[in-house]
């Protein structure tokens, strides 16, 4: 039975994707398992997230994934939880020989809108939020150098995170797309009628495509000034992510424990 997971940053449409998969796969897709007893078992806790991003895919992280996978039913299963790809999802699918039954959805979003969403929601206002949900520039294992971003003040960390996740998505595509089935899509494509239809076709799902209404929209709208500020900074950032990642892989970078 097929299992569906995401490689995505968060604030990228994962809640909407949950509704899409629920409607079109005919199952109760999971967004984020947030019960008290889920953390450390079905949902990575802060220790798991920090361990992977400081030490790599060590034994502690691998034990979490053994628990996680053992609780997944032997049926069609979909989980759009964006924390999973930041603590060893892809590596541990391979370690547990689950690659043949897995489809990974590489979900991206316009980087300006993505960054603005983090800022408006204060997602990086407390270090524990970065530890549990996102990434922190102080982590040892990372692809993008955070130092230039830190010069930007309060917007530096969320902007660095956008580029770090873009690089990680590219890393997993370049390194593992010949081992695990991956579908790459943007939120902007996915939420259009034609894009949703095409994605539905890629998933080889029977029946008509059902397009759900928007989810998890922020009622606090960003100012035009903030959007313009982030747009101008992004325009000045000249980085070839595919080439950077190719060079990084060639230099021996890996998220496996060393």
PLM-predicted stretches and their roles:
Residues 3-5, 76, 103-105:
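Structural motif
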Residues 8-11, 81-82, 111, 189-191:
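Short, flexible loop/turn elements at secondary-structure junctions
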Residues 24-25, 81-82, 179:
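Acidic-histidine catalytic/liganding microenvironments
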Residues 51-57, 80-83, 160-161:
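Short, flexible loop segments at the rims of nucleotide/cofactor-binding pockets, characterized by
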Residues 68-92:
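Glycine-rich phosphate-binding loop used to anchor ATP phosphates in small-molecule kinases
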Residues 88-208:
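PAPS-dependent sulfotransferase catalytic domain
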């Amino acid at each position: 039975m097929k299992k569906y997971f995401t490689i995505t940053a968060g604030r990228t449409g994962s809640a909407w994707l949950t509704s899409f998969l629920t409607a079109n796969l005919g199952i109760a897709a999971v967004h984020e398992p947030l019960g008290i007893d889920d953390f450390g078992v079905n949902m990575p806790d802060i220790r798991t997230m920090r361990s992977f991003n400081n030490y790599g895919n060590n034994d502690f992280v691998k034990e979490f994934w053994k628990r996680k996978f053992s609780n997944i039913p032997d049926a069609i299963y979909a989980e759009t939880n964006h924390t999973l790809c930041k603590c060893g999802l892809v590596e541990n699918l391979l370690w547990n020989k689950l690659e043949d039954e897995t489809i990974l959805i590489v979900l991206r979003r316009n980087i300006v809108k993505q960054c603005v969403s983090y800022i408006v929601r204060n997602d990086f206002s407390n270090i524990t939020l970065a530890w549990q949900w996102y990434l922190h520039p102080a982590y040892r294992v990372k692809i993008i150098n955070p130092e230039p971003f830190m010069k930007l003040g309060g917007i530096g960390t969320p902007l660095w995170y956008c580029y770090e996740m873009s690089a990680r998505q590219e890393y997993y595509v370049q390194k593992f797309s010949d081992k695990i089935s991956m579908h790459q899509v943007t939120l902007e494509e996915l939420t259009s009628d034609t894009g949703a239809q095409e994605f539905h076709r890629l998933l080889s799902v029977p029946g008509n495509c059902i397009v759900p209404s928007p989810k998890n929209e922020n009622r606090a709208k960003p100012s035009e000034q903030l959007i313009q500020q982030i747009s101008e900074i992004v325009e000045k950032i000249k980085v070839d992510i595919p080439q950077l990642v190719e060079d990084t892989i060639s230099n021996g970078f890996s998220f496996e424990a060393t």
